[in-house]
Curated annotation (Swiss-Prot):
This is GTPase Obg. It comes from Clavibacter sepedonicus (Clavibacter michiganensis subsp. sepedonicus). Residues 497-517 have a biased composition (Acidic residues). GO terms for molecular function: GTP binding; GTPase activity; magnesium ion binding. InterPro entries: G_OBG (IPR031167), GTP-bd (IPR006073), GTP-bd_Obg/CgtA (IPR014100), GTP-bd_prot_GTP1/OBG_C_sf (IPR036346), GTP1-OBG_CS (IPR006074), GTP1_OBG_dom (IPR006169), GTP1_OBG_dom_sf (IPR036726), OBG_GTPase (IPR045086).
Length: 517
C-alpha cells in the first residue's frame, strides 16, 4: 500500500449561503410593526494550510471529497443565520495548488500559509435589511448564493537544502541513511526508491536537510521512467549533489557518462519563472562505493577529468563511511552560502489571490444566434449573483431584480445591442436564466404609484397628544361662542326671525309692522 503520495485531485464543495427571511414584527395593539426578517449566514470556506508536520498527501488520496457546512437561514425578530464553519485542510509545505486546467493558483512554500481553495456562498439579506425610506415593507428576501464546487490539483514539491541526484542504485538512499537518522528503503535493485526521502544532517553548528530523489535515467526530462515526477522535487533545492556509481557493471556506463546524461536531463527540465535554473545552482560530485577495489581505481581515474570541469569531487563509501565527514562539511558550506545570499535578497511577501476575470465594465452583452432568433446573453459577476439571489416565485422579488439590472445599465446595453420588446435574454453562461425582455418604459412599472415594498398598513401612526386635544377643544368652543354672538347681532338688526315670526326680543314682527302702517 502506498505511504507517500505527491499528486492528488481534490473534489471540493464549499458551503452555500443561507436564505434571508421574510417576517413582519407583531406587537400589542400593533399587528404590523415593521419588518424583522434576519439575514442568512455565510457558508464555510475550504482553506488549505501549509503545515510543517504534514509530509504527504496520502490522506487526500484516500478521501478526496471534502465539503464545508452551509450557512443557516435567517429568522424573524432580526435573528441572523448561523455561519458555516470553515474547513481547514493541512497540506505539506511546498505544495502547489492548480486548477483543473493546470493553471497555478498558489504555491504553499511558507509554513502557516493559507489559501482559500473553495470560496463559500454569501448569505441572502432579509427583508429588514432591504427596507429603505422608500421601500418600507419589502415582501421578499434574497436567497443565499452557492459556494464553489469543483476540482483542484495538489502537487507536492519537496523542500530541502540539498538534492541527491543520480542513476538508480547509485547509493543515494544509503548516503542519506549514513549521514542522517533517516531510514529509507535500501535494496540491490533499481528504482527501490519511488518517492523522495528526507534526512536532517547536523554538522558542527550547521543543520540542513537532504532529499533523496528517485533515480533518473536518460529521457527523464521528457517523462521517461517517471522522470518528470522525480525532477519536480529538485526545483526547491538550493544545491545539488551528484552521486556517481563507480562499481557499476552495466555495459556502456561509467561515472563521466552518467554525469553527462544527468546534466542533460537537468538542463532540459523547465523551472518556474523566477527560480534559478538547475545547472546554475551549486553542485558537488560524490564518487560512491570506493570500498570496492575496482571502484577506487575508477574513481582515481576519472577524478582529474571531473576536477578539470570545475567540480569539487569527494570519494565516499556508505559502507565504510570513508569521506562522509568531509562531504557533510562541504555541503554545509554550500547551504550556508545559499542561505546568506537569500537573506541579502529578501523576497517580497507573496500575496495569493484567487484569480478572477477583471472587466472594465460590470457586465458584457453577447449576441448569440439561435434557431428562433438572436439571444442576448448578459455576462457579469453582479448580474449573475443577483439572479442567484432572486426568488422567481415572488413577483416583488422579480421586480426588485429588474430595478437593479436597470440601475446597473443592463437595459440601456440591451437597447444598444439591438434588443427589442420580446427578445430572448439570458443572464449567465450555459443554461442561465432565460426570459422574454420587456423594457421598463413599456411595462407596468410606470403605473406603480408607490415604491416597491411600500405598504400603508405599516406606516408610522401619528397620535395627538392631550395638549393638542385641549387646544382643539378650546378652539371649537371659541368658534361656537363667536357664532352665537354673531347670530344675536343679526337678530337684533332684524336680519332674520324665528319660525314663529318672533324677533330676537320676543315681539311679533308682523303685528308691529301693521300697527306702524
Amino acid at each position: 500500500m502506498a505511504t507517500f503520495v505527491d499528486t492528488v485531485t481534490l473534489h471540493l464543495r464549499a458551503g452555500n449561503g443561507g436564505n434571508g427571511c421574510v417576517s413582519v414584527r407583531r406587537e400589542k395593539f400593533k399587528p404590523l410593526a415593521g419588518t424583522d426578517g434576519g439575514n442568512g449566514g455565510n457558508g464555510g470556506d475550504i482553506v488549505l494550510v501549509a503545515d510543517p508536520q504534514v509530509t504527504t498527501l496520502l490522506a487526500y488520496h484516500r478521501g478526496p471529497h471534502r465539503s464545508s457546512r452551509n450557512g443557516g437561514p435567517g429568522m424573524g425578530d432580526h435573528r441572523h443565520g448561523t455561519l458555516g464553519e470553515t474547513l481547514e485542510l493541512p497540506v505539506p509545505v511546498g505544495t502547489v495548488v492548480k486548477d483543473a486546467d493546470g493553471n497555478e493558483l498558489a504555491d504553499m512554500a511558507t509554513p502557516g500559509m493559507r489559501f482559500i481553495a473553495a470560496e463559500a456562498g454569501q448569505g441572502g439579506l432579509g427583508n429588514a435589511s432591504l427596507a429603505t425610506t422608500k421601500r418600507k415593507a419589502p415582501g421578499f428576501a434574497l436567497l443565499g448564493t452557492q459556494g464553489y464546487e469543483g476540482d483542484v490539483v495538489l502537487e507536492l514539491k519537496v523542500v530541502a537544502d540539498v538534492a541527491l541526484v543520480g542513476y538508480p542504485s547509485a547509493g543515494k538512499s544509503s548516503l542519506v541513511a549514513a549521514i542522517s537518522a533517516a531510514k529509507p528503503k535500501i535494496a540491490d535493485y533499481p528504482f527501490t526508491t519511488l518517492h523522495p526521502n528526507l534526512g536532517v544532517v547536523e554538522v558542527a553548528d550547521s543543520r540542513y536537510t537532504v532529499a533523496d530523489v528517485p533515480g533518473l535515467i536518460e529521457g527523464a526530462s521528457e517523462g521517461k521512467g517517471l522522470g518528470l515526477e522525480f525532477l519536480r522535487h529538485v526545483e526547491r533545492c538550493s544545491a545539488l549533489l551528484h552521486v556517481l556509481d563507480c562499481a557499476t557493471l552495466d555495459p556502456g556506463r561509467d561515472p563521466v557518462s552518467d554525469l553527462d546524461i544527468i546534466l542533460t536531463e537537468l538542463a532540459a527540465y523547465p523551472v518556474p519563472d523566477g527560480q534559478v535554473p538547475l545547472l546554475e545552482r551549486p553542485q558537488l560530485i560524490a564518487l560512491n562505493k570506493i570500498d570496492v577495489p575496482e571502484a577506487r581505481e575508477l574513481a582515481e581515474l576519472v577524478r582529474p577529468e571531473l576536477e578539470a570541469r570545475g567540480y569539487r569531487v569527494f570519494d565516499i563509501s556508505t559502507v565504510s563511511h570513508d569521506g562522509l565527514r568531509q562531504l557533510s562539511f562541504a555541503l554545509a558550506e554550500l547551504v550556508k552560502d545559499a542561505r546568506t545570499k537569500a537573506a541579502e535578497e529578501p523576497e517580497a511577501p507573496r500575496i495569493v489571490l484567487r484569480p478572477r476575470a477583471v472587466d472594465e465594465k460590470p457586465f458584457t452583452i453577447r449576441v448569440d444566434g439561435g434557431s428562433y432568433g438572436d439571444i442576448y446573453r448578459v455576462i457579469g459577476t453582479k448580474p449573475e449573483r443577483w439572479v442567484q439571489q432572486t426568488d422567481f416565485r415572488n413577483d416583488e422579488a422579480v421586480g426588485y431584480l429588474a430595478d437593479r439590472l436597470a440601475k446597473l445599465g443592463v437595459e440601456d446595453g440591451l437597447f444598444k445591442a439591438g434588443a427589442v420588446a420580446g427578445s430572448s435574454v439570458v443572464i449567465g453562461e450555459g443554461d442561465g436564466v432565460v426570459f422574454d425582455w420587456e423594457p421598463t418604459l413599456t411595462s407596468t412599472a410606470e403605473l406603480i404609484t408607490s415604491p416597491r415594498g411600500a405598504d400603508a398598513r405599516v406606516d408610522p401612526i401619528s397620535r395627538r397628544t392631550n395638549q393638542a386635544r385641549r387646544e382643539d377643544y378650546f378652539a371649537r368652543m371659541d368658534a361656537k361662542a363667536e357664532a352665537r354672538a354673531e347670530l344675536v347681532r343679526e337678530g337684533e338688526a332684524g336680519l332674520w326671525a324665528d319660525e314663529d315670526g318672533t324677533g330676537q326680543d320676543g315681539t311679533d314682527e308682523d303685528a308691529t309692522t301693521d300697527a306702524k302702517a
